[in-house]
């Protein structure tokens, strides 16, 4: 979890990481 990121930004980052795994 990166500090300084908005909550929505954090959720998008997690979604992007899951896409990269697939």
From Swiss-Prot:
The keyword Cytoplasm applies. Residues 7-22 have a biased composition (Basic and acidic residues). This is Fuctinin-2. It comes from Rattus norvegicus (Rat). To human SET/PHAPII protein. One of its GO terms (cellular component) is cytoplasm. Its main location: cytoplasm. It is found in: Cytoplasm. Oligomer. It comes from the Eukaryota. Has a role in the physiological regulation of fucosylation processes. Keywords: Cytoplasm. Residues 1-22 are annotated as: Disordered.
